[in-house]
Amino acid sequence: MMASHGKAGPGSFGLEANLENAIRNVLNITEFYPPQAEGIENGLTGGNLMLSIPTASGKSAVAYVCMLQKILNNKGSKGIYVVPLKALAKEKFVEISALSEELNLKSSLAVGDRGSEVGSLQDWDILVCTSERLDSLIRSKQDFLDTVGCLVIDEFHLIDDHGRGPTLEIIISRARHENPNCQIIALSATVGNANKVAEWLDAKLVTSEWRPVELRSGTFSDLILKIHRVDSKNPVQLPNPRSVTGNPNHGLRALISDTLEENGQALVFVNSRASAQKEARELSKHLIRESNKEGRASADKISLWNEVSTKLVGADENTSMGKALSECVAGGVGFHHAGLSPRQRDIVEEAFKEGV
């Protein structure tokens, strides 16, 4: 077990040698963040664990390590990784299937969409699924949970959600009743009632405000950007408010242009599919105009936009939605909503991750 001080890498926890290698090779982790190390140390005891730490602090890696170690240590034991959204399930499946391949384990994806499901539901070591799909599987097969040694619930704070909460509660209650030996690992953003929820789960609570990157929260009005709060692992003085160049009647365009000039990226949230497409279309036109100005966008950047744009009107995506998305992406802006095809979503998400 890890010492209570000092740095902790994959070799600090007494893991199976092939799992240590998989962590390094697949997850590219040579040293865990402090809250990750504490979570792994507690999770490897086999008891229930609730990990409540900020976004991007590496919660999933903790669950992967604990779940895989349990499967490797207990022959015939299975693991289930539950997420709220199909897109998130596919993202986690890519990571888990890569880890599984290193460990000679079988992984499957179940999201309720036959065209998107991967692997066999009859022969798996690790299943990645949405909460609704797992609820359906449990109801249709009485002994489905009998061999599950570890159940991971990602985005656990959604148990308070009126739509998804009841399904999550039923899944957890059935798992605890039908298979008391099943370890439950709940991954959550920081929440106010973490102690009470952990008590309900009979789980060890690991919570932290530590985050690997600085998070700034602020407001933007009348072309003035004001930072009100900075969350960082080190004390930071609030920066002075600053003005952003642009048209005060088009504040969003000004803020996006300012962000891109700093080599940053932006996510803009709106309340409907139509609004997402409209804003993307207008921002794309604006950025194309801006890119024609000297120094605003490199030829390499424009080439990357065009490359992604071309993918979106390929043989399989030559639809009105594909064309609309392609036109927006040619200006460096995409839109993302439930009306996109799986391939369109994949292309847009991958382009954003790569900083295109």
Language-model segments: residues:
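Helicase-associated low-complexity/disordered flanking segments
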Residues: M1-M50, G76-S77, K285, S291-A330
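Conserved C-terminal RecA-like helicase domain
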Residues: Y81, F93, S97-S108, S275-V356
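SF2 helicase catalytic motif II
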Residues: L127, S131-D135, K141-I184
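Conserved interdomain linker/interface between the two RecA-like ATPase lobes of SF2 helicase motors
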Residues: S173, N181-E282, G334
